[in-house]
Structure formats: C-alpha cells, structure tokens
C-alpha cells in the first residue's frame, strides 16, 4: 500500500495530506494494518472485517470452504489464524470508521468491539441491524455514510 500512497502523493492534482484507506471484508483488516504502518494515512474505514479470521474455516459451509484453499494454501485454518490485528490496532492513531451488518455471522459486530477496544485513535462504529456480509443489501445507505464521514474527517 505504501507504494500506492507514494504514487498518489507524488501527483500535483491530488492533496497528499488527505489520504484515506479503506477496505471491505479482508480488505478492512489490511486497511487498518496500513494505517498503523504508514503515517501519511489520515483516516481509515473498514466494512465487515475481522480482528482475526481465525476459526472461520471450520464454520464455513461446504460450498465456501474449498475455495479457501485457493486463497490460503494447503492449510487455510492455520493461515487464517496467522492473520490478525493483535499488536497492530494500538499503533493506528487516525480516525477509524467501522461499518457492520447485524445479520452477518461471518464477521459479526463483535469484531468491531474488539478492534475498538485496542485501536489507538478515535473510532466510530455503525451497525445496520439487517445488514449482511459486506452490506450488499444496505449499500444504498452505507456508501453515503462512508463518503460523508470521509469528507468530514479529512
């Protein structure tokens, strides 16, 4: 991500002092890691992400589980357990927006609570009670919320 931020901040037509990163699902976890590692990031948002995806593999349905071998290699459960925000959250000090669906058993809002408890900066958490994973059924509400938050924060 730092190489992308390098490219963006080198452009004359962009304000390099107003860099935000964000991600959905796994991307949200890595957006927080980027904010912790790169001081040029001024805000971060994440949607339907995890503190760690550890334990998810065993709970996946029979259609989803085989695809995880493509993403995570021969031992998906071990690889998922190694992906974590432990020791990272406290190093990120910029504002964080977390947006979750209340009807998302794969990445429930309890992950937002765990992230917020360790995060090093201000945290805003919004939960759409009927929202599913990655908020596909409430994007018409979540997208403007994220855009407005970014405009206000940056």
Predicted regions and their residues:
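Hydrolase active-site cap/lid region
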Residues: 32-78
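Short beta-strand/loop motif that positions the catalytic acidic residue
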Residues: 91-93, 98-100, 104
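Catalytic histidine-centered segment of alpha/beta-hydrolase-like enzymes
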Residues: 131-143
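Catalytic histidine neighborhood in serine/cysteine hydrolases
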Residues: 116-134
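Alpha/beta-hydrolase active-site loop
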Residues: 1-13, 33
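Alpha/beta-hydrolase fold nucleophile elbow
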Residues: 12-25
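Conserved alpha/beta-hydrolase "acid-adjacent" motif
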Residues: 105-111
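Glycine-rich nucleophile elbow surrounding the catalytic serine of serine-hydrolase chemistry
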Residues: 23-33
């Amino acid at each position: 991500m730092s190489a992308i931020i390098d490219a963006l901040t080198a452009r004359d037509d962009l304000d390099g002092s107003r860099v935000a990163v964000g991600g959905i699902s796994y991307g949200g976890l890595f957006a927080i890691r980027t904010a912790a590692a790169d001081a040029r990031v001024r805000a971060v948002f994440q949607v339907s992400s995890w503190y760690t995806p550890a334990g998810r593999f065993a709970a996946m349905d029979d259609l989803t589980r085989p695809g995880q071998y493509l993403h995570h290699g021969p031992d998906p459960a071990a690889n998922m357990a190694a992906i974590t925000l432990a020791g990272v959250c406290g190093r990120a000090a910029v504002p964080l927006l977390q947006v979750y669906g209340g009807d998302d058993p794969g990445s429930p809002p309890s992950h937002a609570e765990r992230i917020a408890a360790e995060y090093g900066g201000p945290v805003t958490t919004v939960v759409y009670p009927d929202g599913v994973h990655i908020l596909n059924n409430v994007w018409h509400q979540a997208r403007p919320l994220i855009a407005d938050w970014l405009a206000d924060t940056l």
